[in-house]
Regions:
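Conserved NTP-donor binding/palm subdomain of two-metal-ion nucleotidyltransferases/polymerases, i.e.
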Residues: 1-58, 64-140
Length: 140
């Protein structure tokens, strides 16, 4: 345990951009450890040509395989995350929920993406998007 004397200032929290980028790595680690398929979407997951320098993201957005969303959320809740908005109350499309963690900040967990696929067909839609995924370093 680290202790601080009266003369030692408390460490500064990491900048928001660093915390969000590292949150993406954290989520990938959790997903890999539990064999859950996640796609990092929006924000820092976009290429730098699209997500231009000087623009900042305030959360980490994930698209999770629909059949694995409940298990992924349970794992996150057990790791200290709290629900800010449920699927049913967070969006008119009921496609995403928002979680908060005191260290990591906010994340939006998407179970589908509005406009992609039809109700009841989201697993097949995820398969198509999954097959076209690319690897990108977000936090390094």
């Amino acid at each position: 345990m680290t202790t601080h004397s009266a003369n030692t200032p408390e460490p500064l929290p990491p900048p928001l951009a660093a915390r969000i980028r590292l949150a993406h790595a954290y989520f990938q680690h959790i997903a890999d450890a539990h064999s859950i398929d996640v796609l990092h979407i929006k924000g820092y997951a976009f290429s730098q040509e699209i997500y231009r320098k000087g623009r900042y993201s305030s959360d980490a957005d994930l698209l999770v395989r629909p059949s694995q969303v409940d298990r992924f959320v349970k794992i996150l809740l057990a790791d200290g995350w709290r629900i800010q908005a449920h699927f049913e109350t967070g969006s008119v499309f009921e496609h995403a929920m928002t979680l908060y963690h005191a260290s990591w900040g906010l994340t939006d967990i998407h179970r589908f993406f509005p406009g992609l696929g039809r109700h009841g067909d989201y697993e097949k839609t995820f398969d198509r998007v999954w097959a076209a995924r690319h690897t990108r370093f977000i936090a390094h």
